[in-house]
Amino acid sequence: MERFEARLRAAEPEVRELLDRVPLLPTPPFPPDWLRCEMLERLDVLRHAPLEHAGTVLEVGSGAHAIATIPLAYDVGPEGRVIAGERSRWGKFLAIVAGSGMGDRIHPVACDARRLPLCDNSADLAVCVHGLRSLQGEENSVRIVREMLRAAPRVFLAESLPIARTDAQSAHLAMYDLREDVFLAASGTTDDLRYAPLERLASLVEAAGGMVETMETLEVDLPHFLAHFPRTLVEGIRPRDLRQRLLQRWDEADAMQRRFGEDHPPVGIVVARRR
């Protein structure tokens, strides 16, 4: 975590104060400040978003820890607001938001992003940060991006790319690429799909009726902690041959993470507008 601590020391005082208010979450094998590190990455990514000060932002897939929600609320300022949409995985969301001091800017909405309970043009910008991989396939993703473009005239999409330039990025991908296969075998659900190339993100936008304005790749250079999952999940898979193959892959990925750590892959960013 030395790079995170160095980046934090170099950050604006307001950013340090914001992250200091984010609670420490001891979640082995992660360090207690893993959530603060992830939020710093989101702040980096959102510097590339066309956010308006005092604007209204719709976030699709705010998740259980408000990892992008709180940075969004910080960026829009005290007069802005974030409509935080999430279907079911609220977890510690409300407690983390309350501790951050951003609660008056954040409006959580329980909803299915395929049918957003919002009028047309309810927001200035719709965003999905590191969430496309959880939208359960291309058809679903297109439908949700289409809804985002109905609720806001512009969208901002950011997602990790299937690129590894360092051993620590390779360690992340080795574990992350197991998630889809393991979850499908263990529960029959397809969640955390493999990362898609930047061109695929752009094609999703175009299929949803959007027009790409800009595309870029961002190098983050920060640790990442969200690929790891318990070995016991693999141990519960019934088909013996499949279980053994996946256990071997899990052990190899875990060994890589212990040796090299785990870093964010490059992040693909797409900004688009409604046609």
Feature-to-residue mapping (PLM):
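Conserved alpha-helix/loop element of class I SAM-dependent methyltransferases that forms part
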Residues: 35-54, 71
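Class I SAM-dependent methyltransferase Rossmann-like catalytic core
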Residues: 7-43
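Conserved Class I S-adenosyl-L-methionine
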Residues: 213-275
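Short alpha-helix
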Residues: 192-209
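Conserved class I S-adenosyl-L-methionine
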Residues: 156-181
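A conserved beta-strand element that flanks and buttresses the S-adenosyl-L-methionine
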Residues: 127
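A short, conserved alpha-helix within the catalytic core of class I
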Residues: 135-147
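Class I SAM-dependent methyltransferase SAM/SAH-binding core
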Residues: 58, 63-115
